[in-house]
């Protein structure tokens, strides 16, 4: 981009000034907060096995400790991907925490069970409440660790129920991670 801009005659100072104002895309490897231990917490929309693997791969080179991943799978959606999501997290994360992510009209426990079925013999932490799962990840993250909260990204609600009973409960992974980091002793 820089070379192309300069080759069109745009002054270098103008190009560099524009670059300083670039903003990251909300919910795509968005750095939410640093834990008190100094571990960065990232939020990403990764809600498929390939996207989860890509997000983990993008962060892995920057981890000197553990890569802690919080994730789930949406209800009333592609049920076949759930075991694959579990397999990816179990194989590629150092600590995987399975939680709820827009269960909609499905039983959240059954969604988590389908994810866990793909984890093999790997030890996985299951925490139903998304806020509690994020709090656990933030709490256990130490120096050199990175936390990835995957699945919701830019979304600002947790979808539960279906039809007339459907509700969207306020929930923002970035805000929750910041709150959890602020509540740490």
Sequence positions of predicted segments:
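ATP-dependent carboxylate-amine ligase
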Residues: 3-185
